[in-house]
Amino acid sequence: MAKQEYKQLPKRAEVHSATEQFKDTVKTSLGLDLFKGLGLTIKEFFSPSVTIHYPMEQLPLSPRYRAVHNLQRLLDSGSERCIGCGLCEKICTSNCIRIITHKGEDNRKKIDSYTINLGRCIYCGLCAEVCPELAIVMGNRFENASTQRSQYGSKSEFLTSEQDAKNCSHAEFLGFGAVSPNYNERMQATPLDYVQEPSKEESQEETPTNPESNKGDENV
C-alpha cells in the first residue's frame, strides 16, 4: 500500500508591529468573510418564518397522535362507553391501568375506579386498539406537566364531560388509520412515485396467450 502524502499549508506570518496588527484587523473585519456572513443573515431575515409563537400558536396535530388518554361517552345519551371488560388493563405492557368493578343489580359490571398512572405509561396505544367499545382513545393533550403526581391519573380527568357528549362538542375518534391534516404537503416522494405505468401497447405485448385455450375455442 502506497504511503499517503499530505500537503502542508504554509504557516501564517506572525504580526509583530502595531501597524501590521491594525492592517490585519481591518482586513479580517472588512474582508469578504464578513460580508458573506452578513449576506446570509440578511437573506434569512427577510425569508418566511418557519417557527410559530408557542404557546399562543399551535400547529394542528394528527388524529393518530398519542397523548393523554380520553374516556369517551355515547353521543346520544351521554352514558359512559366503558363496559368494564378489563382488556385495556390486561394488554397494558407498562402495567399502569387499574380497573375496579362490581356487579350491579342488573348483573352488569359497574366501574368503581379507573386510574392510569401517567408516570409509567409509554403511550403505545394498545389499550385504545383493543377496546371493543372505543371507550378509551388516545387524545392530543400533551401539555400535562405537573409538580405532583396526585394531580393527574384519576378517571375524572380522562372522562369526557356529559354535557360535551350530549352537545356533540367533542369529535368522534377517527382511528389510527385517519388521514393527517395537510398530508399532501407533508408527503414525501417514494421510489414508487418514479415508476412509470406501462402503456397499453406494452401491456398487450406482455400478456401471454395460452395456445391450449385457443384450440379449445376453435373446437367449440
From Swiss-Prot:
Membrane topology: Peripheral membrane protein
Listed GO MF terms: 4 iron, 4 sulfur cluster binding; iron ion binding; NADH:ubiquinone reductase (non-electrogenic) activity; quinone binding
Pfam family, one: Fer4_7
Entry superkingdom: Bacteria
Chain sites annotated for binding [4Fe-4S] cluster 2: 92, 121, 124, 127
GO CC terms in record: plasma membrane
Record keywords: 4Fe-4S, Cell inner membrane, Cell membrane, Iron, Iron-sulfur, Membrane, Metal-binding, NAD, Quinone, Repeat, Translocase, Ubiquinone
Free-text remark on how the cofactor is bound: Binds 2 [4Fe-4S] clusters per subunit.
Family annotation (PROSITE patterns): 4FE4S_FER_1 (PS00198), 4FE4S_FER_2 (PS51379)
Keyword Metal-binding included in the entry's annotation: yes
InterPro entries in the record: 4Fe4S_Fe-S-bd, 4Fe4S_Fe_S_CS, NADH_quinone_OxRdtase_chainI
Binding-site residues for [4Fe-4S] cluster 1, renumbered to this chain: 82, 85, 88, 131
Enzyme class: translocase
EC number, UniProt record: 7.1.1.-
HAMAP family recorded: NDH1_NuoI
Family membership noted in the UniProt record: Belongs to the complex I 23 kDa subunit family.
Quaternary assembly: NDH-1 is composed of 14 different subunits. Subunits NuoA, H, J, K, L, M, N constitute the membrane sector of the complex.
Role summary: NDH-1 shuttles electrons from NADH, via FMN and iron-sulfur (Fe-S) centers, to quinones in the respiratory chain. The immediate electron acceptor for the enzyme in this species is believed to be ubiquinone. Couples the redox reaction to proton translocation (for every two electrons transferred, four hydrogen ions are translocated across the cytoplasmic membrane), and thus conserves the redox energy in a proton gradient.
Protein name from the UniProt record: NADH-quinone oxidoreductase subunit I
Organism: Helicobacter pylori (strain ATCC 700392 / 26695)
Gene that this sequence comes from: nuoI
